[in-house]
Amino acid sequence: MAVISMKQLLEAGVHFGHQTRRWNPKMAKYIFTERNGIHVIDLQQTVKYADQAYDFMRDAAANDAVVLFVGTKKQAADAVAEEAVRSGQYFINHRWLGGTLTNWGTIQKRIARLKEIKRMEEDGTFEVLPKKEVALLNKQRARLEKFLGGIEDMPRIPDVMYVVDPHKEQIAVKEAKKLGIPVVAMVDTNTDPDDIDVIIPANDDAIRAVKLITAKLADAIIEGRQGEDAVAVEAEFAALETQADSIEEIVEVVEGDNA
């Protein structure tokens, strides 16, 4: 059984590609047709490649892989952060800083500075510093958190990188390739698929499409780490949360189901 159904893909608008004049000819084999000047992605292939991506991510996670989620455009930022956190992984959802992977030592120093500023606030150092200095430190922390907060606790260079829109994230993809890090990516009709190790032909501009694919890959990581049952349990709780706004109401729903 496919991890994502054709119906889910259609409802999320995964099939809508870019304008035909903006296409990359290397994506021709993943295109079903053209309609009103827009390429339509072949969802039968998306189903197949999504299955392959799921298996790849699940197996990597089962071997304790560190996964970095990357998506810096507004349509991807929220989903990338939410699903990385949900699956216990790491993310970059604002501008990619050149050298994030290839100059990891320097990035680690910036992360150490971020942690130092946080400690200063927690241990009371801020209380004895001049207000002007505290304001500057807070400004520095905010900037560091914006760009590095999602990888603050990443223990090492990632073993796998998941990318939403590799056309936009070309620098990130190049750094990953240079270091031999496999890249899993949503690939739209305007993108060169050759640099991607595990592709998912998909509309990477629609929020619902990005959320659907990204959430499914997060599920793969959870399954790889905790087993298939963990994904089912999490889905059950997610369904409960749509019915209840408080812990008390969730308990009532659960007890009602068991009555």
From Swiss-Prot:
Molecular-function GO terms, alphabetical: structural constituent of ribosome
InterPro entries referenced in this protein's UniProt entry, alphabetically: Ribosomal_uS2, Ribosomal_uS2_bac/mit/plastid, Ribosomal_uS2_CS, Ribosomal_uS2_flav_dom_sf
Q: Name one Pfam family in it.
A: Ribosomal_S2
Keywords annotated in UniProt: Ribonucleoprotein, Ribosomal protein
Top-rank taxon:
Bacteria
What GO CC annotations are associated with the protein?
A: cytosolic small ribosomal subunit
Q: Name one GO biological process term.
A: translation
State if Transmembrane is listed as a keyword. Answer: no
Keyword Ribosomal protein attributed: yes
Show the CDD domains listed in the entry. RPS2
Q: Which family does it belong to?
A: Belongs to the universal ribosomal protein uS2 family.
- By its UniProt entry, which PANTHER family does this protein fall under? 30S RIBOSOMAL PROTEIN S2 PROKARYOTIC AND ORGANELLAR (PTHR12534), SMALL RIBOSOMAL SUBUNIT PROTEIN US2M (PTHR12534:SF0)
The protein's name: Small ribosomal subunit protein uS2
- Record the organism: Streptococcus pneumoniae serotype 4 (strain ATCC BAA-334 / TIGR4)
